[in-house]
Amino acid sequence: MNEIRDILIGVDFGREVSQICYYDRKRQEPAEVSMKVGANLFENSTCVCCWGKNQEWSIGLEAEYFAREREGFLVENLFELCEEDQGVQVGEQYMEAWELAAVYIQGLIRFLGSMEPVKNTKCLAITVQRLNGKMVKNLQKACESCLWTTPRAFTTMLTASDQIFAAGMWDGSILKAMKCRFENCLPA
């Protein structure tokens, strides 16, 4: 990632897969972030896994691996849990939908490689295919629990009916909409 301060982050939070990107000011365009070093793998399964005696968390491909190989507790229906505001039993603990979403969002943001992502983020935009009040509440609480409550960062949520997506271009990628939406965050 080329950015170190005032990072503009976009997250596509999807039913089955999600992805993250950031706005590269040098190239003046959004840049995708690979989920696997040395590969062009930009989508990550929208799931989390709690595993091991230390209750470690993983997301996406790693979550699927640890569920299979280390007998972790895999939560695959994260999108639906947030949409319906339902918690779920994960091992010995009961987790609310927003808590699981926070684990997932933090995990995605780690792929950016920023040492202090909250401090260095100017804007976090989250897109979803379908938005309801429960989803908004869960994603807002997830971001707040990740400490995205300072004036330096804010969350924007878009839906398939948002004017940016009016042409029906929602294809699992926020990239085309990022530049348009983030122009409001860029210095004049």
Predicted features and spans:
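N-terminal short leaders/motifs
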Residues: M1-D6, K141-S145
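Gly/Thr-rich phosphate-binding beta-strand-loop-beta motif of the actin/hexokinase/Hsp70
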Residues: N2-E32, A166-A188
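Flexible loop/turn segments at secondary-structure boundaries
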Residues: V17, N132-M135, I164-F165
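Phosphate-binding loop and its immediate beta->loop->alpha context
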Residues: K26-T149
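Generic detector of low-complexity/intrinsically disordered segments
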Residues: E43, E80, A160, A166-A167, ...
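Conserved phosphate-binding/catalytic loops in two-lobed NTP-binding clefts
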Residues: E144-F165
